[in-house]
């Protein structure tokens, strides 16, 4: 008997004995394919099975399934003869309550909310011009590279960036994140970003850890939670001082661009000039009214005295304006010096090389001979072969 013959016999056997059965479990992974077909894994406490629901069947389902949904399926078991891989083909689907992940998330969220960990009274304000910024994430992640690239594009060279490497997925991730958070919180930073790119509900579930949530709450450093995408919510989002929908959005929230700072200074100068002109116009009008009043009352001496007072006031205003302008010039010089000091760091970053294999960032120790990789810098990329 050949392999093909065996697979065909097993396929016929499975499909004849396991048809029109009810299967229940929790979605642990799902792909909504562009073709309209749905491919997902269904699990219980001990096992999982690959499932598919083709377009013709899922058009009748009144919702889009997601990781964490607890479902009841009707369908049959089938085997793909070419690979010998069997799966459950669903013909109908309905929700059967919450899955384990969703239930754990909601229970912890409710309990921490009752304890007051999400109360706005405890939220710390973010700094307007941060000078020491920490980022907790995987040092090899694409999210980190995107964040550093965006900082460089903004030309915000006032801040020094501290990177704290941590696991952002898996059972060991909460402990790793807590250790990194404690280390960062002891460094007197202006603000701290906890970041991770997108992923499945299971991939992001380490950010629903209770111990991590309590560590974030008691930290003295303002914390931004930037986990996943816009639609992803985790416990760290609620307990942090600010929630950013993505890692890049955290950078946009925290950092002004060089152009923004220049425009802000120009606006301040314009407002000072307007204020000065307004006050001078008021004093001129007052002087004119006083002159008219005392002229009719034949009090030239009093008019002269008021004129002198007006001149004194004008001198005081000139002095105040000059001091304010000097202060703005000193502040601008300070910002410019800080910009020049940190500009060198970002010029060096242009020489950094990122190695990607199969579209993912690769570690040098994982590469083998004849591997095809993509070498990327800030300005170009090349394909290379490992010798």
Swiss-Prot record:
Signal peptide: none annotated. It catalyses: Exonucleolytic cleavage in either 5'- to 3'- or 3'- to 5'-direction to yield nucleoside 5'-phosphates. Its EC number is 3.1.11.6. Keywords: Cytoplasm, Exonuclease, Hydrolase, Nuclease. It is found in: Cytoplasm. One of its GO terms (molecular function) is exodeoxyribonuclease VII activity. One of its GO terms (biological process) is DNA catabolic process. InterPro entries: Exonuc_VII_L (IPR003753), Exonuc_VII_lsu_C (IPR020579), OB-fold_nuc-bd_dom (IPR025824). Its main location: cytoplasm. It is an enzyme of class 3 (hydrolase). It holds the Pfam family Exonuc_VII_L. GO terms for cellular component: cytoplasm; exodeoxyribonuclease VII complex. HAMAP family: Exonuc_7_L (MF_00378). Bidirectionally degrades single-stranded DNA into large acid-insoluble oligonucleotides, which are then degraded further into small acid-soluble oligonucleotides. Heterooligomer composed of large and small subunits. PANTHER family: EXODEOXYRIBONUCLEASE 7 LARGE SUBUNIT. Belongs to the XseA family. This is Exodeoxyribonuclease 7 large subunit. It comes from Campylobacter jejuni subsp. doylei (strain ATCC BAA-1458 / RM4099 / 269.97). The lineage of its organism: Bacteria, Pseudomonadati, Campylobacterota, Epsilonproteobacteria, Campylobacterales.
């Amino acid at each position: 008997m050949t392999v093909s013959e065996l697979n065909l016999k097993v396929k016929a056997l499975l499909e004849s004995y396991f048809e029109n059965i009810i299967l229940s479990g929790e979605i642990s992974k799902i792909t909504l394919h562009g073709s309209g077909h749905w491919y997902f894994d269904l699990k219980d406490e001990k096992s999982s099975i690959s499932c598919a629901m083709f377009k013709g069947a899922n058009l009748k389902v009144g919702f889009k399934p997601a990781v964490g949904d607890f479902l009841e399926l009707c369908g049959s078991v089938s085997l793909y003869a070419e690979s010998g891989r069997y799966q459950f083909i669903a013909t109908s689907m309905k929700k059967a309550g919450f899955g384990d992940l969703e239930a754990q998330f909601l229970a912890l969220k409710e309990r921490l909310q009752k304890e007051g960990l999400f109360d706005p009274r405890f939220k710390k304000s973010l700094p307007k011009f941060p000078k020491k910024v920490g980022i907790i994430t995987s040092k090899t992640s694409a999210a980190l590279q995107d964040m550093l690239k965006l900082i460089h594009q903004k030309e915000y060279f006032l801040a020094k960036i501290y990177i704290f490497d941590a696991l952002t997925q898996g059972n060991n991730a909460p402990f790793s994140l807590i250790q990194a958070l404690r280390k960062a919180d002891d460094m007197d930073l202006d603000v701290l970003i906890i970041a991770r790119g997108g992923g499945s509900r299971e991939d992001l579930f380490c950010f629903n850890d209770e111990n991590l949530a309590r560590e974030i709450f008691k930290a003295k450093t303002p914390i931004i939670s930037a986990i996943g995408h816009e639609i992803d919510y985790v416990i760290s989002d609620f307990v942090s001082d600010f929630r950013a929908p993505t890692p890049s959005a955290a950078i946009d929230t925290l950092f002004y661009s060089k152009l923004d700072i220049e425009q802000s200074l120009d606006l301040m100068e314009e407002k000072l000039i307007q204020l000065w002109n307004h006050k001078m116009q008021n004093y001129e009008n007052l002087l004119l009214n006083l002159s008219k009043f005392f002229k009719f009352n034949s009090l030239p001496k009093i008019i002269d005295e008021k004129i002198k007072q007006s001149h004194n006031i004008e001198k005081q205003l000139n002095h105040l304006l000059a001091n304010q302008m000097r202060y703005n010039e000193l502040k601008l010089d300070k910002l410019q010096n800080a910009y020049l000091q940190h500009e060198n760091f970002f010029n060096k970053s242009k020489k950094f090389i990122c190695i990607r294999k199969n579209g993912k960032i690769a570690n040098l120790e994982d590469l083998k001979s004849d591997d095809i990789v993509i070498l990327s810098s800030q300005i170009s990329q090349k394909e290379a072969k490992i010798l």
